[in-house]
Amino acid sequence: MPREDRATWKSNYFLKIIQLLDDYPKCFIVGADNVGSKQMQQIRMSLRGKAVVLMGKNTMMRKAIRGHLENNPALEKLLPHIRGNVGFVFTKEDLTEIRDMLLANKVPAAARAGAIAPCEVTVPAQNTGLGPEKTSFFQALGITTKISRGTIEILSDVQLIKTGDKVGASEATLLNMLNISPFSFGLIIQQVFDNGSIYNPEVLDITEQALHSRFLEGVRNVASVCLQIGYPTVASVPHSIINGYKRVLALSVETEYTFPLTEKVKAFLADPSAFAAAAPAAAATTAAPAAAAAPAKAEAKEESEESDEDMGFGLFD
């Protein structure tokens, strides 16, 4: 009987993962190292209605995906990334929103001897509150200290553990004595699967504004190269036309040949004082309508106030 129950459970698991792969176009492959059952339950509750978390043995997940490749060949891209303690987070919502929800469910954790550090750990300069009898402990770790008012004071920031290092017993003891929980554990996104494409989670940090600025930078680079080699493109043609017009204008100014667009330029070059006089006149012409509009508004306001006053007093005449 237990064997049959196990077989039934496997069959149901295969059906479930295939159903999720069919129903949800997007998913995360997440690492679940150091995530306990209580934290996993909290993550599932916070994602309820927005995403579905599925964990399982790697061999079973690979077998289920391989059996479904006929219907969805794009799933083969998932297989190389199913290694280690991983699972899936399926969703139809915005991937950035789900990513942020997973990050919000990380919990701080104390350093344990033998654990692999997921991040760098630095002990800040501080008064530890520990008695002088612990001085030798700090010296063994190469931490410079002094005794201040009967307690040990760390003089400068100390990099205690590097990313990827194994936490030693002394480092773990020190961090616990200082009440420092340097690590945070949760579901870590390793890969993103989106409608048949798979990519690194860093792509989610790229905003529309960043894409727009990168695109404009690319267009400028293309235009610059095309102008240099004389190869016309959509990006370079406007600049080529303007540069050509400038050359024709310069040639016309230097020669007797004139066309309508150069007559005004030649006139200003012949008499620069006319250009100096034209600039204030143009500014005055622009400012005149605005200046005329201001008194008109003031007069209209006064008339409105007078009419309001007449209406108010006229009721009692």
Curated annotation (Swiss-Prot):
Phosphoserine modification, residue list: S304, S307
Family classification: Belongs to the universal ribosomal protein uL10 family.
Cross-link for Glycyl lysine isopeptide (Lys-Gly) (interchain with G-Cter in SUMO2), residue positions: K297
Biased composition (Acidic residues): 302-311
PTM annotation (Phosphotyrosine): residues: Y24
CDD domains: Ribosomal_P0_L10e
Modified residues (Phosphothreonine): T59
Record location of the Glycyl lysine isopeptide (Lys-Gly) (interchain with G-Cter in SUMO1) cross-link: K297
Cross-link annotation Glycyl lysine isopeptide (Lys-Gly) (interchain with G-Cter in ubiquitin), location: K264
Cited InterPro entries: Ribosomal_protein_uL10 (IPR050323), Ribosomal_uL10 (IPR001790), Ribosomal_uL10-like_insert (IPR040637), Ribosomal_uL10-like_insert_sf (IPR043164), Ribosomal_uL10-like_sf (IPR043141), uL10_eukaryotes (IPR030670)
GO terms for biological process, alphabetical: cellular response to interleukin-4; cytoplasmic translation; ribosome biogenesis
Species annotation: Mus musculus (Mouse)
Name of the protein described by the UniProt record: Large ribosomal subunit protein uL10
Subcellular localization(s) per the UniProt record: Nucleus; Cytoplasm
Function, in words: Ribosomal protein P0 is the functional equivalent of E.coli protein L10.
Signal peptide positions (record): none
Processing after translation: Ubiquitinated at Lys-264 by RNF14 and RNF25 in response to ribosome collisions (ribosome stalling).
Assembly: P0 forms a pentameric complex by interaction with dimers of P1 and P2. Identified in a IGF2BP1-dependent mRNP granule complex containing untranslated mRNAs. Interacts with APEX1. Interacts with FMR1.
Gene, per the UniProt record: Rplp0
